[in-house]
């Protein structure tokens, strides 16, 4: 009869603890890039929609991640990964 392999990996922290730590990190980053009023209103909307549940926590994390990603792609002044806005010159020298 087959037996399940023993857990040989490192001890992992509980999912809930990890999720709350992730939320704190994302909130700290969001506060650096967005007005607090916007973030408060987003939090209120999530709370009104999901209440005080883990689904609400996950929705807030997902929304903040999407907002930060778009913010960085558009070209955050603090970021090195934003789209660089360059003007193209017609009939200019080609890159080869």
Curated annotation (Swiss-Prot):
Where in or outside the cell it occurs: the entry states: Virion; Host nucleus; Host extracellular space
Gene3D superfamilies the UniProt entry points to: 6.10.210.10, VpR/VpX protein, C-terminal domain
| Other comments on record | HIV-1 lineages are divided in three main groups, M (for Major), O (for Outlier), and N (for New, or Non-M, Non-O). The vast majority of strains found worldwide belong to the group M. Group O seems to be endemic to and largely confined to Cameroon and neighboring countries in West Central Africa, where these viruses represent a small minority of HIV-1 strains. The group N is represented by a limited number of isolates from Cameroonian persons. The group M is further subdivided in 9 clades or subtypes (A to D, F to H, J and K).
Q: Which InterPro entries match?
A: RetroV_VpR/X
Q: Where is this region: Homooligomerization?
A: 1-42
According to the record's subunit comment, the protein's assembly and interactions are: Homooligomer, may form homodimer. Interacts with p6-gag region of the Pr55 Gag precursor protein through a (Leu-X-X)4 motif near the C-terminus of the P6gag protein. Interacts with host UNG. May interact with host RAD23A/HHR23A. Interacts with host VPRBP/DCAF1, leading to hijack the CUL4A-RBX1-DDB1-DCAF1/VPRBP complex, mediating ubiquitination of host proteins such as TERT and ZGPAT and arrest of the cell cycle in G2 phase.
Q: Name one GO biological process term.
A: symbiont entry into host cell
Q: What does this protein do?
A: During virus replication, may deplete host UNG protein, and incude G2-M cell cycle arrest. Acts by targeting specific host proteins for degradation by the 26S proteasome, through association with the cellular CUL4A-DDB1 E3 ligase complex by direct interaction with host VPRPB/DCAF-1. Cell cycle arrest reportedly occurs within hours of infection and is not blocked by antiviral agents, suggesting that it is initiated by the VPR carried into the virion. Additionally, VPR induces apoptosis in a cell cycle dependent manner suggesting that these two effects are mechanistically linked. During virus entry, plays a role in the transport of the viral pre-integration (PIC) complex to the host nucleus. This function is crucial for viral infection of non-dividing macrophages. May act directly at the nuclear pore complex, by binding nucleoporins phenylalanine-glycine (FG)-repeat regions.
Write out the PTM section of this UniProt entry.
Phosphorylated on several residues by host. These phosphorylations regulate VPR activity for the nuclear import of the HIV-1 pre-integration complex.
Keyword Zinc: yes or no?
A: no
Family, per entry: Belongs to the HIV-1 VPR protein family.
What are the Phosphoserine sites (modified residues) in this protein?
Answer: 79, 94, 96
The question of whether Coiled coil is a record keyword is answered with no
GO cellular component terms, semicolon-separated: host cell; host cell nucleus; host extracellular space; virion component
Keyword terms: Activator, AIDS, Apoptosis, Cell cycle, Host G2/M cell cycle arrest by virus, Host nucleus, Host-virus interaction, Ion channel, Ion transport, Modulation of host cell cycle by virus, Phosphoprotein, Transcription, Transcription regulation, Transport, Viral penetration into host nucleus, Virion, Virus entry into host cell
Q: What is this protein called?
A: Protein Vpr
Principal location: virion
């Amino acid at each position: 009869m087959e037996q399940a392999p023993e857990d040989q990996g490192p001890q992992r922290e509980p999912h809930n603890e990890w999720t709350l730590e992730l939320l704190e990190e994302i909130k700290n980053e969001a506060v650096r890039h967005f007005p607090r009023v916007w973030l408060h209103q987003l939090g209120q909307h999530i709370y009104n929609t999901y209440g005080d549940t883990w689904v609400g926590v996950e929705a807030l994390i997902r929304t903040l991640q999407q907002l930060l990603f778009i913010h960085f792609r558009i070209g955050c002044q603090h970021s090195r990964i934003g789209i660089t806005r360059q003007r193209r010159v017609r009939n200019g020298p080609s890159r080869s």
